[in-house]
Amino acid sequence: MTKRPVLIKEAILVNQAFETIDECLEQSGKLLVDNGDIEPEYILSMKEKVEQHPYTTYLPGAGVAIPHGMSEGFKYINHTGISVLQIPNGVDWLGEKVFIVIAIAANSDEHMNVLASLGDSLESEEDAKNLWKTNSVDKIYDILS
Protein backbone atom coordinates (compact mmCIF):
# COMPACT_ATOMS: atom_id res chain seq x y z
CA MET A 1 0.00 0.00 0.00
CA THR A 2 1.31 3.42 -0.90
CA LYS A 3 1.76 6.06 1.80
CA ARG A 4 -0.88 8.79 1.71
CA PRO A 5 -2.90 10.76 4.27
CA VAL A 6 -5.19 8.58 6.34
CA LEU A 7 -7.80 11.34 6.62
CA ILE A 8 -8.65 13.84 3.91
CA LYS A 9 -11.23 16.61 4.17
CA GLU A 10 -13.28 15.11 1.33
CA ALA A 11 -13.94 12.12 3.60
CA ILE A 12 -15.68 14.24 6.26
CA LEU A 13 -19.41 15.06 6.12
CA VAL A 14 -21.05 17.35 8.69
CA ASN A 15 -24.71 17.92 9.59
CA GLN A 16 -25.84 14.48 8.48
CA ALA A 17 -28.99 12.60 9.52
CA PHE A 18 -29.40 8.83 9.54
CA GLU A 19 -32.06 6.51 10.92
CA THR A 20 -30.03 3.30 11.12
CA ILE A 21 -26.55 1.89 11.59
CA ASP A 22 -26.83 0.40 8.10
CA GLU A 23 -27.35 3.85 6.55
CA CYS A 24 -24.27 5.12 8.41
CA LEU A 25 -22.17 2.19 7.20
CA GLU A 26 -23.32 2.69 3.60
CA GLN A 27 -22.47 6.41 3.61
CA SER A 28 -19.17 6.10 5.47
CA GLY A 29 -18.19 3.24 3.18
CA LYS A 30 -19.16 5.23 0.09
CA LEU A 31 -16.77 8.00 1.15
CA LEU A 32 -13.97 5.44 1.44
CA VAL A 33 -14.86 3.96 -1.97
CA ASP A 34 -15.03 7.41 -3.59
CA ASN A 35 -11.55 8.21 -2.25
CA GLY A 36 -10.14 4.92 -3.54
CA ASP A 37 -9.40 3.57 -0.07
CA ILE A 38 -11.59 0.48 -0.37
CA GLU A 39 -13.52 -1.67 -2.79
CA PRO A 40 -17.31 -1.73 -2.24
CA GLU A 41 -17.08 -5.25 -0.79
CA TYR A 42 -15.42 -3.82 2.33
CA ILE A 43 -18.72 -2.17 3.29
CA LEU A 44 -20.24 -5.65 3.69
CA SER A 45 -17.28 -6.56 5.89
CA MET A 46 -18.03 -3.55 8.13
CA LYS A 47 -21.67 -4.66 8.39
CA GLU A 48 -20.55 -8.19 9.33
CA LYS A 49 -18.31 -6.77 12.06
CA VAL A 50 -21.22 -4.82 13.58
CA GLU A 51 -23.42 -7.95 13.47
CA GLN A 52 -20.84 -10.42 14.79
CA HIS A 53 -18.80 -8.23 17.17
CA PRO A 54 -21.04 -5.23 17.85
CA TYR A 55 -19.30 -3.95 20.95
CA THR A 56 -15.99 -3.51 19.12
CA THR A 57 -17.53 -0.84 16.89
CA TYR A 58 -18.22 2.03 19.29
CA LEU A 59 -16.90 3.80 22.38
CA PRO A 60 -19.52 3.42 25.13
CA GLY A 61 -20.61 6.76 26.55
CA ALA A 62 -18.49 8.82 24.15
CA GLY A 63 -21.05 9.24 21.37
CA VAL A 64 -18.53 7.89 18.87
CA ALA A 65 -18.78 4.79 16.67
CA ILE A 66 -15.70 3.36 14.98
CA PRO A 67 -16.88 0.77 12.47
CA HIS A 68 -14.30 -1.30 10.65
CA GLY A 69 -14.23 -4.53 8.71
CA MET A 70 -13.50 -8.13 9.55
CA SER A 71 -10.00 -9.45 8.87
CA GLU A 72 -11.43 -11.34 5.88
CA GLY A 73 -12.28 -7.94 4.40
CA PHE A 74 -8.69 -6.66 4.44
CA LYS A 75 -8.25 -7.81 0.83
CA TYR A 76 -10.71 -5.08 -0.20
CA ILE A 77 -8.56 -2.28 1.27
CA ASN A 78 -6.49 -0.34 -1.25
CA HIS A 79 -5.13 2.29 1.17
CA THR A 80 -5.45 2.98 4.85
CA GLY A 81 -8.12 5.61 5.30
CA ILE A 82 -10.89 6.89 7.51
CA SER A 83 -14.16 8.65 6.84
CA VAL A 84 -16.11 10.76 9.31
CA LEU A 85 -19.84 11.41 9.59
CA GLN A 86 -21.08 14.04 12.02
CA ILE A 87 -24.70 13.45 13.03
CA PRO A 88 -25.88 16.35 15.26
CA ASN A 89 -29.13 14.64 16.29
CA GLY A 90 -27.42 11.29 16.71
CA VAL A 91 -28.31 7.81 15.59
CA ASP A 92 -29.08 4.76 17.74
CA TRP A 93 -26.02 2.49 17.78
CA LEU A 94 -26.83 -0.64 19.76
CA GLY A 95 -28.79 1.31 22.34
CA GLU A 96 -26.32 4.19 22.58
CA LYS A 97 -26.70 7.58 20.93
CA VAL A 98 -23.83 8.16 18.50
CA PHE A 99 -23.02 11.59 17.04
CA ILE A 100 -19.76 10.83 15.23
CA VAL A 101 -19.07 7.81 13.01
CA ILE A 102 -15.42 7.27 12.12
CA ALA A 103 -15.09 4.37 9.68
CA ILE A 104 -11.66 2.76 9.48
CA ALA A 105 -10.13 0.92 6.54
CA ALA A 106 -6.78 -0.47 7.66
CA ASN A 107 -5.06 -3.82 7.39
CA SER A 108 -3.99 -5.72 10.49
CA ASP A 109 -0.56 -4.06 10.61
CA GLU A 110 -1.94 -0.51 10.56
CA HIS A 111 -5.29 -1.05 12.27
CA MET A 112 -4.03 -0.68 15.85
CA ASN A 113 -1.96 2.39 14.94
CA VAL A 114 -5.04 4.09 13.49
CA LEU A 115 -7.11 3.18 16.57
CA ALA A 116 -4.38 4.45 18.90
CA SER A 117 -4.16 7.71 16.97
CA LEU A 118 -7.93 8.16 17.15
CA GLY A 119 -7.83 7.38 20.86
CA ASP A 120 -5.28 10.14 21.35
CA SER A 121 -7.45 12.55 19.35
CA LEU A 122 -10.53 11.68 21.40
CA GLU A 123 -8.71 11.52 24.71
CA SER A 124 -11.14 13.77 26.50
CA GLU A 125 -14.91 13.84 26.49
CA GLU A 126 -14.59 17.52 25.57
CA ASP A 127 -12.78 16.63 22.32
CA ALA A 128 -15.51 14.17 21.41
CA LYS A 129 -18.21 16.73 22.16
CA ASN A 130 -16.40 19.34 20.04
CA LEU A 131 -16.74 16.92 17.12
CA TRP A 132 -20.49 16.63 17.74
CA LYS A 133 -21.09 20.35 17.89
CA THR A 134 -18.99 21.90 15.15
CA ASN A 135 -20.25 22.64 11.65
CA SER A 136 -16.70 22.85 10.38
CA VAL A 137 -15.01 20.15 8.32
CA ASP A 138 -11.73 21.95 9.04
CA LYS A 139 -12.23 21.71 12.81
CA ILE A 140 -13.05 18.00 12.64
CA TYR A 141 -10.01 17.49 10.42
CA ASP A 142 -7.80 19.40 12.87
CA ILE A 143 -9.02 17.42 15.88
CA LEU A 144 -8.55 14.04 14.19
CA SER A 145 -5.30 14.75 12.32
Residue ranges and their predicted role:
Residues 1-145:
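Cytosolic covalent-transfer regions centered on His/Cys nucleophiles
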